[in-house]
């Protein structure tokens, strides 16, 4: 679900544990055409709250990865994977025939890598995945905060 939160674009994914993509910012705003995009991903439920800062080069193709999953709505064999520039956000996708299961990994940054948190969300193939890809694309293309 796409929404506005504190005057910035937010994407929410999931049910029992909600993933929230928010606070898009340029890492080096003084550099013209800076490709380094940072954003926060927060995983929250009644029992847990985890937040990680994610560094990408113009989104690292997360929206394209999700769009390709949507296009392959009939299914695929095995896992498909994606990771952000510094590995602070990972995503693996599995198609069961009836659902697409996305396992989102939030990771501590190197060199410590002391913790990681994973949550799996289920999505209907096709339109549901296409909507998610579109929401992530709109988020990554939105105006970064200063």
Regions found by a protein language model. Name each.
Residues 1-48, 54-55, 139-146:
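Charged, alpha-helix-forming regions
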Residues 109-146:
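Mixed-charge, glycine-accented linear interaction segment located at domain edges/termini
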Residues 62-69, 132, 136:
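Short, structured motif recognition centered on aromatic/hydrophobic residues
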Residues 33-38, 81, 89-113:
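Intrinsic, low-complexity N-terminal interaction/targeting segments
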Residues 32-34, 48-62, 119-130:
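Short, low-complexity cationic-aromatic patches
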Residues 74-89, 142-146:
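Short glycine-rich, low-complexity/disordered patches
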Residues 15-17, 46-50, 87, 98, ...:
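Short acidic/polar mixed-charge low-complexity motifs
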Residues 13-14, 20-24, 42-44, 53-57, ...:
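A structural detector for beta-sheet-dominated domains
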